[in-house]
A protein has these predicted regions:
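Extracellular glycoside hydrolase catalytic/binding regions
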Residues: 1
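Low-complexity, serine/threonine/proline-enriched polar segments
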Residues: 16-20
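Extracytoplasmic
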Residues: 25, 29-190
Length: 190
């Protein structure tokens, strides 16, 4: 109608459409996405990173999908972090898992009963995630990495930009839903 390609809707249809839009937009029918609001309001003028849901307490459990809030290159690095299909006519998913967060990190639903319902997947070389941590007590820690994969790979851990362990090997578990624990012992955290 607004492009002049059809006749005007009836008053009844217009009112019904407006009322449906109002109902669909009601706060009770929507889900608050902390990362989306942060990206639209704060990140447009700041590269600062913030904890996703408060700092991760160590000792404790850290979920990969709860990496810090912040822009690409500051809170995370991902090979396919945006889609430019408007300019290129070639759609590319920026989050190949299509779940949980609107950033470029590939997050998908997880069947792991020890997880938070999500897993980071589709990882490739030079991708990384940043986490704010609160180390309760200096000392040596064992780190358990819970993962599932159809191929082997490696990852490293840094604290304040300083490597604390390189090349933790994660082996093929045979399936993206066959989760196993990888123990890395004796990491000193100040």
């Amino acid at each position: 109608y607004f492009r002049g390609e059809s006749s005007a809707p009836s008053v009844e249809n217009a009112v019904n459409g407006l009322m449906q839009l109002a109902e669909d937009s009601h706060i009770s029918n929507n889900r608050f996405q902390r990362d989306v609001v942060d990206a639209m309001i704060r990140q447009v003028s700041s590269n600062e990173t913030l904890p996703f849901d408060g700092p991760n307490i160590i000792p404790g459990v850290l979920f990969a999908s709860d990496y810090d809030l912040g822009p690409m290159g500051y809170a995370y690095s991902d090979a396919d972090y945006a889609t430019y299909h408007i300019n290129t006519d070639n759609f590319q998913a920026w989050n190949q898992g299509w779940q949980y967060r609107n950033d470029g990190v590939d997050i998908e639903n997880s069947s792991d009963t020890d997880g938070n319902g999500y897993q980071v997947g589709f990882t490739s070389e030079d991708e990384w995630l940043l986490f704010t941590v609160d180390i309760q007590e200096s000392g040596f820690y064992n780190i358990v990495t819970r993962y599932a994969s159809t191929s082997s790979g490696i990852f490293s851990l840094e604290l304040d930009g300083i490597p604390i362990v390189d090349n933790i090997i994660l082996y093929n578990t045979g399936s993206y839903s066959n989760f196993v624990n990888k123990l890395t012992q004796g990491l000193y955290l100040p």
